[in-house]
UniProtKB/Swiss-Prot annotation:
Catalysed reaction equations from the record: UDP-N-acetyl-alpha-D-muramoyl-L-alanine + D-glutamate + ATP = UDP-N-acetyl-alpha-D-muramoyl-L-alanyl-D-glutamate + ADP + phosphate + H(+)
Pfam family, one: Mur_ligase_C
Protein role: Cell wall formation. Catalyzes the addition of glutamate to the nucleotide precursor UDP-N-acetylmuramoyl-L-alanine (UMA).
GO molecular function: ATP binding; tetrahydrofolylpolyglutamate synthase activity; UDP-N-acetylmuramoylalanine-D-glutamate ligase activity
Pathway as given in its UniProt record: Cell wall biogenesis; peptidoglycan biosynthesis
The organism of origin for this protein: Agrobacterium fabrum (strain C58 / ATCC 33970) (Agrobacterium tumefaciens (strain C58))
Binding site for ATP: G121, T122, N123, G124, K125, S126, T127
PANTHER family named in the record: UDP-N-ACETYLMURAMOYLALANINE--D-GLUTAMATE LIGASE (PTHR43692:SF1)
Name listed for the protein in its UniProt record: UDP-N-acetylmuramoylalanine--D-glutamate ligase
Domain of life per record: Bacteria
Record lineage: Bacteria, Pseudomonadati, Pseudomonadota, Alphaproteobacteria, Hyphomicrobiales
GO process terms (BP): cell division; cell wall organization; peptidoglycan biosynthetic process; regulation of cell shape
First-tier enzyme category under EC: ligase
Family: Belongs to the MurCDEF family.
Length: 469
């Protein structure tokens, strides 16, 4: 745990006592802050009380006596409208921050020069974050991995010199971290997502920009217009920018040509690594993820040789284009993390004949952008609330059925793929949708897919059944 000593003796209000919120409350108490916490869920309040954390309905407190208000990242700060606790804090002139900001302030006090790599973007954050941490760990460096990837940042070990922090940051977390200042900050890409929480694409982009604007080295993917503008703007403001691209040659930075990652500097380009044969980094999207990871590791002093070794031994992540089973000539792939069309595109681009399970809670734009990839789809099996919308988009271009539920989709797709004599058939869950209409999160959806694949007769599993690997 990182005790938040920079708030010792100060009164801090906190809302949100879920996983990271409870960790934050503990860290503030351990650092000597006087914490008053609350949550809309009485069970969460009771759990905090059982640990000796002071709780009170934040409607009733005297806000003028508090120095700061810490908000859990899952609670609306601005859109669709501010949470009532945010309104109360702002009315009293109390700053509203999150756990990433608390980490930043502790680092600033105790180890301001310890390497801190922060990663954001619409797609690819978790893979890039895990890849950077793996390269650092495999090269023998003291590495702490946390943030949006699943481990609360304040549950990590305290900052000290030569301890490396690799932190995945969601837009919600950045919004609550006004002084974020990583050694190396990564913005992978920007496409419409979470607009229910940010209102407009411009506000979403502005929030993401904060992470790289405060970085020692800003690593920015320039394959979309919003990110390109951000790279140009922060460079004019004096930030050192490394551009990365999976589509085009860049004059300064890293870019991909097929499976090769090249570094451009001073008018010349040199080969850094060839990803060919690294199954966990298959596809052009992973070329971008690898380029970003390489740039970040170079920025914090990792050698090219250490980076190459780490790339080759990367085990990959669950729910991300993950082969989970094989039966006959059919491979079953779990890509449950693909919660929008842009995230599904890399997997659809990586295989030639796909029995595609898609659907769930649809995002803005649906799957229209995937139409160039429709020829790769042998048949689609549509589930969840998006089924009718996706069926209308597929029209006569792709055979489809409305399966409704994941279990039916797996059974029907497996049967159809088995009848197809084409080599290299793939049954793939790559939903292009959020999971919340049928599952609590994409992980549970992916684990359900794996369990249902494991239940098919004659299946050779490539991961532990029901656990997604």
């Amino acid at each position: 745990m990182i005790p938040v000593t920079s708030f010792r003796g100060k009164k801090v209000a906190l809302f949100g006592l879920g996983g990271s919120g409870l960790v934050t409350a503990r860290a503030l108490v351990a650092g000597g802050a006087a914490v008053v916490a609350f949550d809309d869920n009485p069970d969460s309040v009771a759990k905090a009380q059982a640990e000796g954390i002071a709780t009170a309905d934040l409607h009733t407190i005297d806000w003028s006596s508090f120095s700061s208000f810490v908000l859990a990242p899952g609670v609306p700060l601005t859109h669709p409208k501010p949470h009532w606790s945010v309104d109360l804090a702002k009315a009293a002139g109390v700053e509203v921050i999150g756990d990433i900001e608390l980490f930043i302030r502790e680092r600033r006090v105790h180890a301001p020069d310890c390497p801190f790599i922060a990663i954001t973007g619409t797609n690819g954050k978790s893979t890039t974050t895990a890849l950077i941490a793996h390269i650092l760990q495999s090269s023998g460096r003291d590495t702490q991995l946390g943030g949006n990837i699943g481990t609360a940042v304040l549950s990590l070990d305290p900052p000290k010199a030569q301890r490396f922090y690799v932190v995945e940051c969601s837009s919600y977390q950045i919004d609550l971290a006004p002084t974020i200042n990583p050694t190396a900050g990564i913005l992978l890409n920007l496409t419409p997502d979470h607009l229910d929480r940010h209102g407009t694409m411009q506000h979403y982009a502005d929030v993401k920009e904060r992470l790289v604007a405060g970085s020692g080295t800003a690593i920015v993917g320039v394959d979309d217009s919003h990110s390109t503008l951000i790279a140009d703007r922060i460079e004019r403001a004096g930030v050192k920018v490394e551009r990365i691209s999976k589509r085009n040659v860049v004059s300064e930075g890293l870019y991909a040509e097929g499976s090769q990652i090249l570094r451009a500097h001073g008018g010349t380009s040199s080969l850094l690594v060839d990803l060919d044969g690294i199954q966990t980094l298959r596809g052009s999207h992973n070329a971008q993820n690898a380029a970003a990871a390489i740039a970040a590791c170079l920025a914090v002093g990792v050698s090219e040789e250490e980076i190459r070794a780490g790339l080759k031994s990367f085990p990959g992540l669950k729910h991300r284009m993950q082969p989970v089973g094989r039966r006959g000539n059919v491979t079953f792939v779990n890509d449950s993390k693909a919660t929008n069309a842009d995230a599904a595109a890399p997997a659809l681009s990586s295989f030639d004949r796909i029995y595609w399970i898609a659907g769930g809670l649809p995002k803005a734009g649906g799957i229209t952008s995937l139409s160039p990839l429709f020829p790769r789809i042998a048949k689609a099996y549509l589930i969840g609330e998006a089924a009718a919308e996706f069926a209308a988009t597929l029209g006569e271009a792709v055979p489809y059925e409305i399966s409704g539920t994941l279990d039916k989709a797996v059974q029907h797709a497996a049967a159809d793929a088995e009848k197809d004599a084409t080599a290299g058939n793939v049954v793939m869950l790559s939903p292009a949708c959020a999971s919340f209409d049928q599952y609590k999160n994409f992980e549970i959806r992916g684990d359900s897919f794996v369990a249902q694949v494991a239940a098919l007769e004659g299946m050779t599993m490539l991961v532990h059944s029901g656990k997604g690997g």
